[in-house]
């Protein structure tokens, strides 16, 4: 009797780059032993657009429309980090009203980003209903953005020394109404999701990251705080006017996918508290430091020459970057978003290095999903919260 030989080869499966749960064009080459994941190799770069090199050939104002394409679900943070660098290099003072407006916009953007994380995350693990619910509140936030900036996404609102325009009449009251309404929405999410036994089976104890591992891997944001490390750059770096508000850092100690969910849910309620305090205490005054506007020297032109008619009729604003090195960072929804900037006494940066939180947080994915089940990949990847525009840059 011939006994059939048992094959011990692992099955190789390509997950992505067009898988609906990949949150962008991410490709995972998986080695499977039945349902068990033996190995994982992430393949990046499908959305690489050379954002760092583009920055070296643009002024700060010219580069602002590009930065909103990194994390296109939280564009206020990419704009904030882009103008914070030149402001610190030039020691530029931001008016108090502009700082309050920035904080309001940043926290609204944080809520919108967390909402669009929550919906697809629940859909990935089988809960379709919250995916449709989150768009109610998200639409209200985008209405506020559109009223203030003219754009629902890709706002191009922040400027060196302030913001592009003041808040329109009635915007503050409309935003306060949203905050009151949104708190009831968060309570509905928690009632629907947090104690759901099927949800808990899918996320509890899945993708555990210890505090030591989180620090060694350089994780940040909810990934770090869910592992028991109370690290929030809004408290650590004291940027903008966050110190003037009463709010707490959200953290958990379990380090699993459930802890990361709870951190983000808690952050949305804390963001509402910050926004409400900022709306009630926003001062008057200018929304922009007009003294920061420096212009290129205008060359002697003939009235009807080619350059006057076809290239430019007025000079565009330019900010000369001092010959210094600087690293600036903000607490984005996904973690620490940083810029390493080198100026060389010109309008263009000599070097512009981006530190994207999604790219750093994604590095731990192969370790987390080894020896897990195939279905757990979507739970772990969804709990990390990545945007491939930011990962690939």
UniProtKB/Swiss-Prot annotation:
Keywords: Chloroplast, Membrane, NAD, NADP, Plastid, Plastoquinone, Quinone, Thylakoid, Translocase, Transport. GO terms for cellular component: chloroplast thylakoid membrane. It is an enzyme of class 7 (translocase). Its EC number is 7.1.1.-. Its main location: plastid. Pfam families: Complex1_49kDa (PF00346). It is a peripheral membrane protein. GO terms for biological process: photosynthesis, light reaction. It catalyses: a plastoquinone + NADH + (n+1) H(+)(in) = a plastoquinol + NAD(+) + n H(+)(out); a plastoquinone + NADPH + (n+1) H(+)(in) = a plastoquinol + NADP(+) + n H(+)(out). GO terms for molecular function: NAD binding; oxidoreductase activity, acting on NAD(P)H, quinone or similar compound as acceptor; quinone binding. It is found in: Plastid, Chloroplast thylakoid membrane. InterPro entries: NADH_Q_OxRdtase_suD (IPR001135), NADH_UbQ_OxRdtase_49kDa_CS (IPR014029), NDH1_su_D/H (IPR022885), NiFe-Hase_large (IPR029014). The keyword Membrane applies. Gene3D superfamilies: Cytochrome-c3 Hydrogenase, chain B. HAMAP family: NDH1_NuoD (MF_01358). NCBIfam families: PRK06075.1, PRK07415.1. NDH is composed of at least 16 different subunits, 5 of which are encoded in the nucleus. NDH shuttles electrons from NAD(P)H:plastoquinone, via FMN and iron-sulfur (Fe-S) centers, to quinones in the photosynthetic chain and possibly in a chloroplast respiratory chain. The immediate electron acceptor for the enzyme in this species is believed to be plastoquinone. Couples the redox reaction to proton translocation, and thus conserves the redox energy in a proton gradient. Belongs to the complex I 49 kDa subunit family. This is NAD(P)H-quinone oxidoreductase subunit H, chloroplastic.
């Amino acid at each position: 009797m011939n006994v059939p030989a048992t094959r011990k080869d692992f099955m190789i499966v390509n997950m992505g780059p067009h898988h609906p749960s990949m949150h962008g064009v991410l490709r995972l080459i998986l080695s499977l032993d039945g349902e068990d994941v033996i190995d994982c190799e992430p393949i990046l770069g499908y959305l690489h657009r050379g954002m760092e090199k583009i920055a070296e050939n643009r002024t700060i104002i010219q580069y602002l429309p590009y930065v909103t394409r990194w994390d296109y679900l939280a564009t206020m943070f990419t704009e904030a980090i882009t103008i914070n660098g030149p402001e610190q290099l030039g020691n530029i003072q931001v008016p108090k009203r502009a700082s309050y407006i920035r904080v309001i916009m940043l926290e609204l953007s944080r809520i919108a980003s967390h909402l669009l994380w929550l919906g697809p995350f629940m859909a990935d693990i089988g809960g379709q209903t919250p995916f449709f619910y989150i768009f109610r509140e998200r639409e209200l936030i985008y209405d506020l953005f559109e009223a203030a900036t003219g754009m629902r996404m890709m706002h191009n609102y922040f400027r060196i020394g302030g913001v592009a325009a003041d808040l329109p009449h009635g915007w503050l009251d409309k935003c306060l109404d949203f905050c009151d309404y949104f708190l009831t929405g968060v309570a509905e999410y928690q009632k629907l999701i947090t104690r759901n036994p099927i949800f808990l089976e899918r996320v509890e104890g899945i993708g555990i990251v210890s505090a030591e591992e989180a620090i060694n891997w350089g994780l940040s944001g909810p990934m770090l705080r869910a592992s028991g490390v109370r690290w929030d750059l809004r408290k650590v770096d004291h940027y903008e006017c966050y110190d003037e508000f009463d709010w707490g850092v959200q953290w958990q100690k379990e380090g699993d996918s459930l802890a990361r969910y709870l951190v983000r849910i808690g952050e949305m309620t804390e963001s509402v508290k910050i926004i409400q305090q900022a709306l009630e205490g926003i001062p008057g005054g200018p929304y922009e430091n007009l003294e920061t506007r420096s212009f290129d020297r205008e060359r002697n032109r003939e009235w009807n020459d080619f350059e006057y008619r076809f290239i430019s009729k007025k000079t565009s604003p330019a900010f000369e970057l001092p010959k210094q090195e600087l690293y600036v960072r903000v607490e984005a929804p996904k973690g620490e978003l940083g810029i390493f900037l080198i100026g060389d006494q010109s309008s263009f940066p000599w070097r512009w290095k981006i530190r994207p939180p999604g790219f750093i947080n994604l590095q731990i994915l192969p370790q987390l999903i080894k020896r897990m089940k195939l279905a757990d990949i979507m739970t772990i990847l969804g709990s990390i919260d990545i945007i491939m525009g930011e990962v690939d840059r």
